[in-house]
A protein has these predicted regions:
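A substrate-binding/cap region within the structured catalytic cores of diverse enzymes
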Residues: 137-160, 167-183, 188, 195, ...
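Bacterial Sec-dependent N-terminal signal peptides
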Residues: 1-23
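Short glycine-enriched loops at secondary-structure junctions
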Residues: 55-58, 112-120, 161-171, 211-217, ...
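Preference for extracellular/luminal or secreted protein segments
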Residues: 20-73, 279, 288, 310-590
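Second-shell residues forming the walls of enzyme active-site clefts
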Residues: 41, 83, 92-108, 118-120, ...
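Active-site mouth loops of central-metabolism enzymes
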Residues: 52-66, 133-145, 227-241, 304-310
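Short acidic, glycine-rich surface-loop motifs adjacent to enzyme active sites
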Residues: 47, 53, 71-90, 174-175, ...
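Active-site-adjacent structural elements in enzyme catalytic domains
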Residues: 90-107, 139-157, 354, 359, ...
Length: 590
């Protein structure tokens, strides 16, 4: 009995001790926030709400331009609140950030648009993690959590406090030009579940996650970077689909949300009123109806979806009127600050509004460690950022590759012979002109002949090659490579390439691997044996060969519908081939 009483006393002590500690921490946070706020000028209080870009890349020349001198000027003159990292090497960016943070009166909130890790941006020396569509084919949610942790650890190593991820848009439009393979797929439950796991991975290592793009960017036909997309859905329709993942991830405790540039008349019918600058959307729907009180970021204000209709700093004014906390990438910071001050004079805004948003930003800075900021250590930086990427890519590939059709257990899996046999196997590589990892394995493991075709191949060569293959080779392996991620113009896949693959896959012993956006599979749904690989690199290609040989089991399921034959959730589960047992692995659909 004494032990029970003692245990109860200790439990109560721990409980009330935790409450007391939380109160102390809260008091420190409030004290720091108030102290910093009181030290700021009016211009600085407004500038704390702004996130500016550090670099950009020319889409044609691929040349990277850094704006560190310009940003340093904004830090010095206005005490800018945030910086968003884009292209450029990690060491260079880290050195610039160290310099800027040292010069800043108030620690700067560092953000990145790193949906698949910092390698999404720092492409010169950091490998990207798989995109979310490939993750959507995985069935083990712990992998998504571990993925989020790796992305978070990368951010921490780079001195980044906020990652603009995960994307929780439900991609229910296969022709979506801007979200597409950035989404976990078309199923709202999976999008919500995987989004929460990604969020937990980030936030468990001390990086703020950001759900985007509220209220849902998955069913658009226009890229909001170029114009304002229109979604003509009722509130009931939005509530049943698009809003579901946001509601769930809000309840799970996500630190921030990014608001999209969308025109949704059911939310706000004012002409050209994007959801990012709509009070009905941000204050009405997001804050009041859904009850979300975390930090809100606008999508980039340099995008044409809002800039086209609200130029010259007016988009910044409208963003704050709508109820946003942080303004991403206003093109002209001085003009935006001036416009916001004019709006206060005109009583469209108030200094109380600025105080509310500024203190929320400062509180987030305290929460994510900026009150005790340390410089980024650049020693071994790129190696540290890459240290877990390949293992995660391999783990995702082993769990995501999806066998959509398996018509012959005798042919597939295709066990590699002890000694490769000539004129037995041919590999036809579409979209390449030289050996990749898949082609090398086909040569080494099977003694396969390899034919290359680009997407501009003439019909005459295709016809002659098809005839040659039919006469000479018993087994045909086809790989579709290097097509575009975006669905415009059928992913850049030519009719000639479609016809070539269609003819080749009529062979009884043929198998087709599609290395890229799964929506492109619509072109080859009649394949005898068909595998979705989602992305295209050496790791994934080697895993695909292992799957072909029965060395690994197929576990993946389609995250989207690609044609009538293969809908969301399609995928055949296989077992590993046992050479000793002599049994061929049988596949079964789920």
């Amino acid at each position: 009995m004494k032990k029970i009483i003692l245990g109860w006393i200790l439990l109560q002590a721990c409980f009330y001790g935790a409450i007391a500690q939380n109160k102390i921490n809260s008091n420190f946070a409030n004290s720091w926030t108030d102290s910093v706020y009181n030290s700021l000028s009016e211009d600085e209080r407004i500038a704390q709400l702004m996130v500016v870009r550090l670099s950009s890349i020319d889409s044609k020349t691929k040349l990277i331009t850094f704006f560190d001198d310009k940003v340093a000027g904004l830090v010095k003159q206005y005490n800018i609140g945030g910086i968003c990292l884009f292209q450029g090497g990690p060491v260079k960016q880290a050195l610039i950030l160290n310099k800027l943070q040292a010069a800043a009166k108030t620690p700067i909130l560092i953000c990145i648009d790193g949906e698949n890790g910092v390698g999404m941006r720092m492409t010169d020396s950091v490998l990207p993690l798989p995109r979310q569509m490939m993750l959507g084919a995985v069935q083990d949610t712990n992998i998504i959590y571990q993925y989020g942790k790796i992305a978070g650890e990368q951010c921490k190593r780079m001195g980044i406090q906020v990652n603009y991820a995960p994307v929780v848009d439900v991609n229910n439009n296969p022709n979506n030009p801007v979200i597409n393979d950035r989404s976990f797929g078309e199923d709202k439950y999976k999008v919500a579940q995987f989004g929460i796991q990604y969020m937990k991975g980030l936030q468990d290592v001390g990086v703020m996650a950001c759900a985007k793009h509220f209220p849902g960017h998955g069913d658009v036909a226009v890229d909001s970077h170029l114009d304002l997309p229109v979604i003509n859905k009722s509130m009931a329709q939005l509530d049943s689909l698009e809003l579901y993942p946001f509601r769930e991830i809000f309840k799970a405790g996500i630190g921030s949300v990014m608001v999209a540039h969308l025109y949704i008349p059911a939310i706000d019918s004012a002409a050209h009123r994007a959801t990012s600058i709509s009070k009905n959307n941000v204050t009405g729907l997001l804050r009041n109806q859904l009850g979300y009180q975390g930090l809100t970021f606008t999508d980039a204000l340099e995008m044409q979806g809002v800039k086209k209709y609200f130029p010259g700093g007016e988009a910044s004014v409208q963003s704050i009127i709508a109820g946003n906390d942080m303004l991403c990438l206003p093109e002209d910071v001085p003009a935006a600050i001036s416009k916001i001050k004019d709006a206060i004079k005109d009583e469209r805004l108030s200094w109380a509004d600025i105080e509310l948003h500024c203190k929320k930003v400062l509180a987030a800075k305290y929460q994510y460690g900026l009150s005790q900021l340390q410089p980024i250590n650049t020693e071994n930086l790129a190696n540290d950022l890459n240290s877990k990427v390949n293992d995660m890519r391999k783990q995702v590939a082993e769990n995501a590759l999806t066998v959509l059709k398996k018509s012959d257990d005798i042919f597939f899996p295709m066990i590699a012979p002890e000694k490769p046999v000539t004129d037995e196997v041919v590999y036809v590589s579409i979209g390449t002109s030289s050996d990749n990892a898949f082609a090398k394995r086909m040569r080494n493991d099977y003694g396969a002949a390899v034919f290359y075709f680009n997407y501009k191949q003439d019909a005459a060569r295709i016809l002659s090659t098809v005839e040659l293959i039919k006469k000479r080779y018993k087994k045909v392996v086809i790989g579709i490579h290097n097509y575009n991620r975006a669905p415009a113009n059928n992913f850049g896949i030519s009719k000639a390439a479609i016809d070539l693959v269609t003819q080749l896959q009529q062979q009884a012993n043929s198998v087709t691997f599609v290395f890229g956006n799964p929506y492109a599979i619509k072109n080859w749904c009649t394949a005898k044996n068909l595998i979705a690989c989602y992305e295209d690199d050496a790791i994934i290609q080697n895993i695909a060969i292992d799957l072909l040989q029965g060395k690994i089991a197929a576990k993946g399921k389609l995250p989207v519908t690609v044609c009538e034959e293969y809908k969301f959730g399609s995928g055949i589960t296989t077992s590993v081939f046992s050479a000793h047992g002599g049994n061929r692995p049988c596949g079964h659909r789920q």
